[in-house]
Amino acid sequence: GVYFKLITDKLRTKADADLKAHGLTMTQSRVLCFLSDHNGEATQKEIEEFLSVTHPTVVGIVSRLEQNGFITFHPDSADKRNKIVVLTEKAVQVDKEMKEIIRRQDKKLFASLSEEQVKELTFLLQTIYENLNTEEEDTPC
């Protein structure tokens, strides 16, 4: 567990510095990445579900993204009550830059590992993640 914490802290510090240079928080960058992975647009409800947060929280996040020129809104033609959140060209460019930073960081992370070791590590980490997501049985202790 200690190494997970140490690695997470190092990665978060690096990511925060990279994001700060673009005027973004980690959560805001996750929203931009989500939108990028969904053809540049999604409803606020879809963003709520992705982040597992409340509607007011998403309203605050997307409001700041709009103020900083990363997104715009347009009405949902299928349901006028919904607003579609859309990436701006500025956000598309920042997303490309962030993905390149992540690619370089991944290369650095795995530089001393063989391809086979990277595959094994990936498998082990996925297994640990799945173990954490399974419901725990009630134990008497």
Residue ranges and their predicted role:
Residues G1-H22, N68:
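N-terminal leader segment of winged-helix/HTH proteins
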Residues G1-V2, H22-C33, P56:
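Short alpha-helical elements of helix-turn-helix
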Residues R12, S63-F123:
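Charged, amphipathic alpha-helical coiled-coil/dimerization segments
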Residues H38-T43:
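Short capping segments at the starts of secondary-structure elements
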Residues E46-E48:
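A short acidic, leucine-rich amphipathic alpha-helix
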Residues E116-C141:
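C-terminal regulatory/oligomerization modules of transcriptional regulators
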